[in-house]
């Protein structure tokens, strides 16, 4: 305990006043000391929990944690997807069109012995998708079918206009001349000669054939 009085108090104050003062001082010091101890106790508990958490991580985990803080968000998402797929290739589920759904129902009605897995392999979807399509009772009305057909017709017209406006004109390919560099036996100088391409030979042959046909027809007319 901390002493609260000195020798001068015995000379100046009576004994009753002295005892009253000592009791008040002791109670005040005990209350102040208790609050300080409680505050220190709470801080010590927080520090202890922090130390336990830091000590529970190994050096490797701490390095990985620092790397995760530095890696960008897109890379973290890509790593999470690869971890979820377990190294397999990303293959999102395929959605069937209305025509394909109607075709699936028609095949099932004509061949009832086919199961969901076989139909799923045919349409490249999971058996659960096939079961949901076959169990659904929704059918489009005539108005909805008419709207769908009009929409597909407008889509085809837009695509046709787009191709007509951006039509690519095919240009003939220019075949470069083949240059052969060789040396003559008599002179040491280098000589560059051009070799005709295969297309040029084929063109000459076609021209010669046409010329022969025209000449034969001309001779036949004169002979008659």
UniProtKB/Swiss-Prot annotation:
GO cellular component terms attached to this protein's record: mitochondrion; nucleus
Entry's transmembrane regions: none
UniProt entry keywords in alphabetical sequence: Mitochondrion, Transit peptide
Transit peptide start and end: 1-42
Main location: mitochondrion
Amino acid composition bias (Polar residues), ranges on this chain: 186-200
Region span, Disordered: 53-72, 186-224
Feature: compositional bias, Basic and acidic residues: 60-72, 214-224
Residue stretches of biased makeup (Basic residues): 201-210
Disulfide topology: none
Subcellular location(s) of the protein: Mitochondrion
Xref: InterPro entries: NGRN/Rrg9
Record Pfam families: Neugrin
Family: Belongs to the RRG9 family.
Task performed by this protein: Required for respiratory activity and maintenance and expression of the mitochondrial genome.
Protein name: Required for respiratory growth protein 9, mitochondrial
Gene name linked to the record: RRG9
């Amino acid at each position: 305990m901390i002493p609260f009085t000195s020798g001068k108090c015995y000379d100046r104050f009576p004994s009753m006043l002295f005892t009253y003062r000592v009791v008040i001082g002791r109670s005040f010091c005990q209350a102040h000391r208790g609050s300080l101890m409680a505050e220190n106790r709470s801080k010590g508990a927080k520090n202890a929990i922090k130390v336990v958490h830091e000590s529970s991580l190994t050096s490797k985990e701490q390095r990985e944690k620092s790397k995760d803080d530095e890696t960008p968000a897109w890379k973290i998402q890509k790593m999470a997807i690869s971890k979820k797929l377990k190294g397999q290739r990303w293959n999102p589920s395929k959605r069937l069109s209305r025509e394909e759904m109607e075709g699936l129902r028609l095949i099932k009605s004509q061949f009832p012995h086919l199961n969901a897995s076989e139909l799923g392999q045919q349409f490249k979807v999971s058996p659960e998708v096939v079961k949901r399509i076959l169990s659904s009772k929704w059918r489009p009305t005539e108005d909805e079918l008419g709207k769908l057909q009009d929409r597909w017709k407008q889509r085809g017209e837009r695509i046709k206009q787009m191709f007509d406006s951006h039509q690519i004109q095919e240009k003939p390919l220019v075949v470069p001349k083949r240059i052969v560099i060789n040396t003559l036996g008599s002179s040491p100088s280098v000589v560059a000669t051009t070799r005709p391409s295969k297309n040029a030979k084929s063109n000459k042959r076609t021209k010669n054939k046409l010329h022969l046909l025209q000449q034969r027809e001309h001779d036949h007319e004169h002979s008659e």
